[in-house]
């Protein structure tokens, strides 16, 4: 459901963190808002915006955040077991378009992070172009950053859930 990571983060912090959930979709934010009310969570504020233009929208966001979760739009290849028809909409061109957007999001969002902060990049895909290869290229291009850790989960008999990827990135000390 839209916003499940935001509500989970609010619950993990006992509803005490300042969480700003950003999405371009008013419909998704409305669902999130409904879930926040149902769960009585007050620490999550929603912002309808294109995440690639947050600095232009609010310059105070520069070096503002301690932690950022970038749950990037992706091909969703890791969810094919739940969404088998989505395979018919996949193409090399679509993956290329998504990687360009993912890279733009990383470039746009990293300046919002405090110098001692941490960014978590996550996708629900198992496509290396959208995951480790993208992150390696991004860090190679941005010499002030370092990869703290990364994990690729592949669906299997031992793990029947979705495939996904996450990377933790921070500034070098």
Can you annotate each of these PLM segments?
Residues 1-173:
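S-adenosylmethionine
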């Amino acid at each position: 459901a839209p916003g499940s990571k935001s509500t989970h983060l609010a619950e993990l912090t006992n509803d005490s963190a300042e969480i700003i959930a950003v999405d371009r979709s008013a419909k998704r934010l409305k669902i999130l808002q409904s879930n926040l009310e149902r769960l009585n969570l007050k620490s999550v504020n929603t912002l309808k915006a294109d995440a690639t233009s947050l600095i232009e929208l609010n310059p105070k966001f520069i070096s503002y955040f301690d932690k950022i979760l970038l749950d990037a739009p992706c091909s969703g290849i890791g969810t094919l077991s739940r969404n088998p028809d989505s395979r018919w909409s996949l193409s090399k061109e679509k993956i290329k378009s998504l990687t360009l957007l993912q890279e733009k999001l990383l470039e746009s969002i990293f300046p919002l992070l405090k110098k001692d902060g941490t960014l978590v990049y996550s996708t629900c895909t198992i496509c290396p172009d959208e995951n480790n290869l993208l992150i390696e290229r991004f860090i190679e291009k941005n010499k002030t950053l370092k990869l703290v850790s990364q994990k690729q989960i592949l669906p299997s008999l031992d793990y029947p859930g979705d495939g996904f990827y996450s990377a933790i990135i921070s500034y070098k000390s």
